[in-house]
Amino acid sequence: MPKYYEDKPQGGACAGLKEDLGACLLQSDCVVQEGKSPRQCLKEGYCNSLKYAFFECKRSVLDNRARFRGRKGY
């Protein structure tokens, strides 16, 4: 599922997860067929696994213990 490419510049912490979450939302049936905004679809429960992974990645940036272990995600 990850769409990480080596030729892309590294945008920052959790950039790959953020990009994949946006792509997942834009390709979901909620946005394509129903015409809702990605924010509404995210609240309705689409792409939950990527949403959780992005949350954990952002949380690990602030967690001092996780700073030594490395960020979760890609």
UniProtKB/Swiss-Prot annotation:
- Matching Pfam families, A to Z? Pet191_N (PF10203)
Provide the Gene Ontology terms for cellular component. mitochondrial inner membrane; mitochondrion
Tell me which residues make up the CHCH domain: 27-65
Motif window: Cx10C motif: 30-41
Q: Which UniProt keywords apply?
A: Disease variant, Disulfide bond, Phosphoprotein, Primary mitochondrial disease
> Has UniProt tagged this entry with the keyword Phosphoprotein?
yes
Q: Which residues carry this modification: Phosphoserine?
A: 37
Which processes are annotated in GO (biological process)? leukocyte differentiation; mitochondrial cytochrome c oxidase assembly; multicellular organism growth; spleen development; thymus development
Superkingdom to which the source organism belongs? Eukaryota
Disulfide bonding pattern of the chain: 30-57, 41-47
- Motif Cx9C motif — list its residue ranges: 47-57
Illness:
Mitochondrial complex IV deficiency, nuclear type 9: An autosomal recessive, infantile disorder with a fatal course in the first weeks of life, and characterized by hypertrophic cardiomyopathy and mitochondrial complex IV deficiency. Postmortem microscopic investigations show accumulation of lipid droplets in cardiomyocytes and mitochondrial proliferation.
The family assignment reads:
Belongs to the PET191 family.
Job description of the protein: Involved in an early step of the mitochondrial complex IV assembly process.
Q: What is this protein called?
A: Cytochrome c oxidase assembly factor 5
Q: Which organism does this sequence originate in? A: Homo sapiens (Human)
